[in-house]
């Protein structure tokens, strides 16, 4: 007799062997038709999975997040099946699920073309309509390796050979196509209905540039056509908002081959940077931080002491001078510890909050570089808080308040929070980890925040909190972090004199809000589609004349606005006013002031906002009040 407990607490009792599908059918034929898989005692399994002991079971349908992931995983197999039918000599490698879709990597004698992509998608639709049963079987390892070698699938044979001996080798078959996979998968190919192939890209085998270059086909799959169409519309909008396009259109920055992964900031782009940096300086000062500056090039011996040389060496730029070896800093923390160590510290000095707009360099792979979002030279809004264990809870709580206010001021009102706890390999005692994790969780709970636990995902030196923004298109950007560090202060000799006159090692909190200035500006550009809030816009106002008769008045207005700390320029070109308005509107300037003979006579200004919003005529003083209010409110 087997007892299966359902999520509502109901027990289903069977006196014969059953599968997950049998349980679904016992509940009702409707559920059996829509079920995709099951979660058996917390483990995702196929509908064909036998239930041999008393178990807890959750049936997974396409309404569950896991259901959509299973559909996408099965769609990756559908893609590989179609490629093998159309291009039999192609070799299949891996095909995982990614955010919003999936991909599959292939080795083939020639590059796939857009026409190939269309043919593959059409064949996928045909295979879906065949309603092939998808079956799982566990194979003997050597037999599975031989099977794929006989098919000429040498990559699959390599993967199987690398699977640990204690793991089963499971293969999934649909018709005459068989693939290696842990699963689970949908029961029939017909359950994969809504999908689209998106693009072709290059990818190295096992992600190593020393290996063969493969062809990666990306796709997306959804439960309904409506969801897929909404996703495609979001992609289209994201393409319009691409910060690289807008950066060129708005004359903000450029990048070139002579400095890969490094940014040339133009005056307008640098104006945005300066506004962000000045704002951050103000909020840091108000919250008890002191700003410092540390060297960019440090002797390798310091990186060896900190542990970065051992763990981060391949991403560091190295140089040599006078027989000494140096590294350009990839992060700021060792330098901040040196500032803390300079002089005798007392418990009365703690917490000490050291902040730096630290310029860092990391030797990222050229293929990973992406505009402002992934660069080699970047500036972090970095800070390190040195405190006692008893001060951790209060410091974390204060940081959360600061971070939330900063995000709101920049127009982000929703963020996701994850707490990552102790990994298997770690430093520090269990008691230290218990207290540290409890303090971080308590701070999040004290602020009544929703957060997700990520067991085992913390750094080796301490637990961490990650803050992920959601932008106006619903995309997620991990920016803020707070990491508790047991290791580095001890490794670099940091200490303070405690109240009992003994020397103790401080706790070190690594924290950032924006992450990197470059990436955050890229996110801001895309979030606002280039139409930045007034307080951040490089040009807040442009004053336009209709004819030469108004040139002196335009200059007078421009000077008055500058005196009120408003970023303003004038356009006195001998062009039609409609042309000038259109040109500056495309530059996404928040306000255009149009001046003709009537405005000169009445000593007024006619104001146009974005999206052709006509504010009409008003006094210059009235406009100054309007724009300064918007600047103060950061709208």
Swiss-Prot record:
Binding-site positions, Zn(2+): 333, 384, 510
Annotated spans, Catalytic: 242-533
Record flagged with keyword Lipid biosynthesis: no
GO terms of molecular function: ATP binding; metal ion binding; threonine-tRNA ligase activity; tRNA binding
Domain TGS: 1-61
Gene3D superfamilies: 3.10.20.30, 3.30.54.20, Anticodon-binding domain (3.40.50.800), Bira Bifunctional Protein, Domain 2 (3.30.930.10), Threonyl-trna Synthetase, Chain A, domain 2 (3.30.980.10)
BP terms from Gene Ontology: threonyl-tRNA aminoacylation
Listed EC numbers: 6.1.1.3
Family that this chain belongs to: Belongs to the class-II aminoacyl-tRNA synthetase family.
Database matches in PANTHER family: THREONINE--TRNA LIGASE, CHLOROPLASTIC_MITOCHONDRIAL 2 (PTHR11451:SF44), THREONINE-TRNA LIGASE (PTHR11451)
Protein name (database record): Threonine--tRNA ligase
